[in-house]
C-alpha cells in the first residue's frame, strides 16, 4: 500500500487525524520538500512529534528514481508526504500511476491547500477563481520580468471577471548557476508584486504564512505592495477580478485595502 498524505500548510500539527494515524502505522515514510515546505516545522520536528523516521527524497529521487518508494509500498505500508495536499498543485499523479502499474494499492489522505486558504483568508469567493498560475524567478525561465504565459492567464481571467491565484516560485537544490544542493530560495509577495506591477499595476492581495497562527493579509495596488515586507515564507499573491460587494468589503475590512484602490463592486 502506498498512502499519499498531505501535511497541510504550516507545521507538524497541521496534518489531519487520519494522516497522523497513517504516519504512525506505516512501515516506511518518504517525503519531498522541493515543491513546497512547512514553514513552521523542520523535518526533525516532524519526526519527533509523530515518532517516525522520514526519508526525504529530492526531485530525481521521486520523479526519476522512485524505485525505493515503490519497493517499500510493495513490501508493506509506505507513506509519501508533501506539504499541502499531495495531488493539488504539488502533484504526484505520476508516482501514483507507477504504483498502479505495479499492482500496488494507493490511498490519498488530503491536506489543506494554499488555494483553499487563500480564498478563506481573503474573503474572495472560491468559485470566482479562474486558472491559477506560477510566477517563476527571472533566472528560472531564462528571461527578464514576467513570462507572457503568466500575464496571459491573469488577463484571460480578468476578461471573465475571475480572480487569479499566483503561486510564487520555490527553488530548492537549484540556483541561478544550476544545481546547488545548498540553495533554498522562496519568492516573496513584495518581489512578485514588483515584477507584475511593471506590466499590470492593478489591485493585488498578498498572503504570507497561510495556516500559521499569525498569517499576514494585505490588499493594495501591486506597486504599493512592492514597497512592503511580509516576513518569512511561504507567500502567495492574488490578482482579483470583478468584486462582489461582500468581497469588496472583505478586502477593506480584513486586508486593509484602501477603498480608492478597489474597483466598484458588481
Swiss-Prot record:
What's the top EC group for this one? transferase
The protein's matches in InterPro entries, at most eight in alphabetical order, are given as: 4pyrrol_Mease (IPR000878), 4pyrrol_Methylase_sf (IPR035996), 4pyrrole_Mease_sub1 (IPR014777), 4pyrrole_Mease_sub2 (IPR014776), Dphthn_synthase (IPR004551)
GO process terms (BP): methylation; protein histidyl modification to diphthamide
Which reaction(s) does the protein catalyse, per the Swiss-Prot or TrEMBL entry?
Answer: 2-[(3S)-amino-3-carboxypropyl]-L-histidyl-[translation elongation factor 2] + 3 S-adenosyl-L-methionine = diphthine-[translation elongation factor 2] + 3 S-adenosyl-L-homocysteine + 3 H(+)
Alphabetically sorted, this entry's keywords are:
Methyltransferase, S-adenosyl-L-methionine, Transferase
Give the record's pathway: Protein modification; peptidyl-diphthamide biosynthesis
The reply on keyword Methyltransferase is yes
Record's subunit section: Homodimer.
Q: Known HAMAP family for this protein?
A: Diphthine_synth (MF_01084)
UniProt name for this protein? Diphthine synthase
Q: Which organism is it from?
A: Natronomonas pharaonis (strain ATCC 35678 / DSM 2160 / CIP 103997 / JCM 8858 / NBRC 14720 / NCIMB 2260 / Gabara) (Halobacterium pharaonis)
Amino acid at each position: 500500500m502506498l498512502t499519499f498524505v498531505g501535511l497541510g500548510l504550516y507545521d507538524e500539527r497541521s496534518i489531519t487525524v487520519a494522516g497522523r494515524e497513517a504516519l504512525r502505522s506505516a512501515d516506511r515514510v518518504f517525503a519531498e520538500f522541493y515543491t513546497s515546505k512547512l514553514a513552521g516545522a523542520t523535518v526533525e520536528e516532524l519526526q519527533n512529534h509523530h515518532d517516525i523516521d522520514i526519508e526525504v527524497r529530492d526531485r530525481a529521487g521521486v520523479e526519476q528514481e522512485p524505485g525505493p518508494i515503490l519497493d517499500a509500498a510493495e513490501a508493506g505500508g509506505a507513506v509519501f508526504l508533501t506539504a499541502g495536499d499531495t495531488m493539488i498543485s504539488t502533484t504526484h499523479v505520476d508516482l501514483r500511476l507507477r504504483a498502479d502499474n505495479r499492482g500496488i494499492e494507493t490511498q490519498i489522505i488530503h491536506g489543506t491547500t494554499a488555494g483553499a486558504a487563500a480564498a478563506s483568508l481573503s474573503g474572495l469567493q472560491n468559485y470566482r477563481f479562474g486558472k491559477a498560475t506560477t510566477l517563476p524567478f527571472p533566472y528560472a525561465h531564462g528571461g527578464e520580468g514576467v513570462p507572457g504565459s503568466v500575464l496571459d492567464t491573469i488577463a484571460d481571467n480578468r476578461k471573465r471577471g475571475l480572480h487569479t491565484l499566483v503561486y510564487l516560485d520555490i527553488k530548492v537544490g537549484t540556483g541561478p548557476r544550476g544545481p546547488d544542493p545548498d540553495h533554498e530560495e522562496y519568492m516573496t509577495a513584495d518581489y512578485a508584486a514588483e515584477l507584475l506591477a511593471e506590466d499590470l499595476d492593478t489591485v493585488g492581495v498578498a498572503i504570507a504564512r497561510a495556516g500559521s497562527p499569525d498569517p499576514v493579509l494585505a490588499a493594495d495596488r501591486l506597486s504599493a505592495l512592492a514597497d512592503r515586507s511580509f516576513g518569512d515564507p511561504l507567500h502567495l499573491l492574488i490578482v482579483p477580478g470583478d468584486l462582489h460587494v461582500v468581497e469588496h468589503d472583505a478586502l477593506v475590512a480584513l486586508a486593509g485595502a484602501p477603498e480608492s484602490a478597489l474597483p466598484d463592486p458588481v
